[in-house]
């Protein structure tokens, strides 16, 4: 994959990365590297892809930066929520960054992604910017959903990112509908429908998988298994936690979701399979560092030793840092400098997002129904709006 393609995934971050490469000894080589995944892929009724993943120095550095931006964004969102600048629900993604970044590296913007409510980092991976992300979190007009969606409803139409959905598992049938449209239009594209292990027992998921298999739709169902559905451990909710086998007659693949290169390899394989043969299930073995949401401290149903153990042994950013240092692509000091600049970039984005005003009260009635069908929201014709926003 060419460096020019790699450097367009998250535009603001990539521009910074390019400047860093030019100014320092950080490698800008596009010479291929072959790196083995952390663990083998485990497959169900399909031969797994090779563990040997082709990458480049530029791609590894981009992975490091993109995941670091996402991590810093989520940590900042935690602080903004505690300061009551973010209201309502807020679900953070720190720890799971490799899934968003690795998936994006394997596909194009013509492919579609739809996910649940833990959606901030997927939005960034699809090309969203920090200002619109923070503005949306704080309910501001400059947000990606005009401040009306909040944490759970990020959206980016021009990148085929269909959100952020708050109803557990309900995004999967919608994703299979997107895959139906792709096949109907004879496109060489696929849809990735993401859901968590807590949603894996939903009946609608199996209904959608059945029709996708029947019609051989290019649908990839991605279970982000972070091992806890809210506060419920997977073993307490699932008789069979081997989610990649849940499709029965549909092939499946279990992936180390903390290894960005493994995610990239699996998603590339899954897209090719889905376009040619129909649906496939990917189980991403990952982990969230925060609790389920901001009301969950995340330490009542798991030990602090468990969390710190994952951080020390499987953290996706640290894994890439080690690869960069092992291949002499940058020095430890240069990576630290990059992280300092990321903190400033995030702080600047927050300041800019705060300058955006709250939505006007008239926005209560916009974007509720599709235009052109003669349907309006009840009360939209009132001359004086009684509703007010704080």
From Swiss-Prot:
Keyword Nucleotide-binding: no
Binding-site positions, thiamine diphosphate: 117-118, 166, 168, 197-199, 226, 292
Cofactor(s) essential for the protein: thiamine diphosphate; Mg(2+)
Binding-site residues for Mg(2+), renumbered to this chain: 197, 226, 228
SUBUNIT field: Tetramer of 2 alpha and 2 beta subunits.
InterPro entries noted in UniProt: DH_E1 (IPR001017), PDH_E1_Alpha_Subunit (IPR050642), Pyrv_DH_E1_asu_subgrp-y (IPR017597), THDP-binding (IPR029061)
Transit peptide, residues from-to: 1-15
Catalyses which reaction(s): N(6)-[(R)-lipoyl]-L-lysyl-[protein] + pyruvate + H(+) = N(6)-[(R)-S(8)-acetyldihydrolipoyl]-L-lysyl-[protein] + CO2
Gene Ontology cellular-component terms listed: mitochondrial matrix
Broadest EC class assigned to this enzyme: oxidoreductase
Positions annotated to bind pyruvate: 91, 117-118, 166, 168, 197-199, 226, 228
Record's subcellular location: Mitochondrion matrix
CDD domains per the UniProt record, alphabetical: TPP_E1_PDC_ADC_BCADC
Pfam family name, one: E1_dh
Annotated region (Disordered), positions in chain: 293-312
One Gene Ontology term from the biological process aspect of the record: pyruvate decarboxylation to acetyl-CoA
Keywords associated with the record: Magnesium, Metal-binding, Mitochondrion, Oxidoreductase, Phosphoprotein, Pyruvate, Thiamine pyrophosphate, Transit peptide
GO molecular function, one term: metal ion binding
Biased composition (Basic and acidic residues): 302-312
Protein name from the UniProt record: Pyruvate dehydrogenase E1 component subunit alpha-1, mitochondrial
Species: Oryza sativa subsp. japonica
Documented EC number(s): 1.2.4.1
Biological role stated in the UniProt entry: The pyruvate dehydrogenase complex catalyzes the overall conversion of pyruvate to acetyl-CoA and CO(2). It contains multiple copies of three enzymatic components: pyruvate dehydrogenase (E1), dihydrolipoamide acetyltransferase (E2) and lipoamide dehydrogenase (E3).
